[in-house]
Amino acid sequence: MAQVIKRKPTSPGRRFVVSIVDKELHKGASYAPLTQSKNRISGRNNVGRITTRHKGGGHKRRYRIIDFKRNKDDITARVERLEYDPNRSANIALVLYTDGERRYIIAPHGLSVGYTIVSGNSVAIQAGNVMPLSNIPLGGVVHCIELKPMKGAQIARSAGAFAQLIAKEGNYVTLRLRSGEVRKVLADCRATIGEVSRSEHSLKKLGKAGATRWRGVRPTVRGVVMNPVDHPHGGGEGKTSGGRHPVSPWGTPTKGYKTRSNKRTDKLILRHRNKG
């Protein structure tokens, strides 16, 4: 079980730090055959222009190849170890199948070393097992949910995430997501039982700007302190408030303006998510 630790203020940079410490995590290196190099492009495109702002720098990482499909049916796997993954907020687990293959999976809450998991159409309802949504009882809590059968998990993959199955009707089941959104998903899609590990992640505080830079995130500059050539809010004599409703650098209204436009899947969303 992870612990939330508030650090002693031995320096200005440590004063506001709140850390998440999990003593069950593996202390050594990751499993090399399931990792690959990850090149940073710092938000630039092929001609070197910035296409995504506020990216650059940060500690070098290796990508862990995660099994989001969980398609080895009716073959049990034993959890060898739990690991930290720098590429996501949740912990990951290295599992060993009885046929000798190893895979990384998103670690659900409550999973420990030595536990046995399995995927299939009719498996036990326990954390880490995978089955079609049609076979999961109403009220069940799931994560790593597919949107298309056998495409791999796309929903509820971050730390502490989960969805609750609240209805079944025809070829679809209805899920209530943690954001408050209620949507339909094909009943043949698979999901993992339980919620994602490391639910304490939301309590973590980095404590200083440098810790954000270690993660490859650069500062965000306000538009009102820029020049008119750089932002619609820029310019003016002395300090100004921008003089117009908030917009992005490209003139799109922001701070609450809806930009989602996907009519193809709107029919599957019964209630949109709560405002953040």
Swiss-Prot record:
Family: Belongs to the universal ribosomal protein uL2 family.
InterPro entries, sorted: NA-bd_OB-fold (IPR012340), Rib_uL2_dom2 (IPR014722), Ribosomal_uL2 (IPR002171), Ribosomal_uL2_bac/org-type (IPR005880), Ribosomal_uL2_C (IPR022669), Ribosomal_uL2_CS (IPR022671), Ribosomal_uL2_dom3 (IPR014726), Ribosomal_uL2_RNA-bd_dom (IPR022666)
Taxon lineage: Bacteria, Pseudomonadati, Pseudomonadota, Gammaproteobacteria, Candidatus Pseudothioglobaceae
Name the UniProt record assigns to this protein: Large ribosomal subunit protein uL2
NCBIfam families the record matches: rplB_bact
UniProt keywords, alphabetically: Ribonucleoprotein, Ribosomal protein, RNA-binding, rRNA-binding
One GO process term, biological-process aspect: cytoplasmic translation
Highest taxon above the source species: Bacteria
Oligomeric and partner information: Part of the 50S ribosomal subunit. Forms a bridge to the 30S subunit in the 70S ribosome.
Region (Disordered): 224-276
Entry's Gene Ontology molecular function annotations: rRNA binding; structural constituent of ribosome; transferase activity
One term under GO cellular component: large ribosomal subunit
PANTHER family, alphabetized: LARGE RIBOSOMAL SUBUNIT PROTEIN UL2M, RIBOSOMAL PROTEIN L2
One Pfam family cited in the UniProt record for this chain: Ribosomal_L2
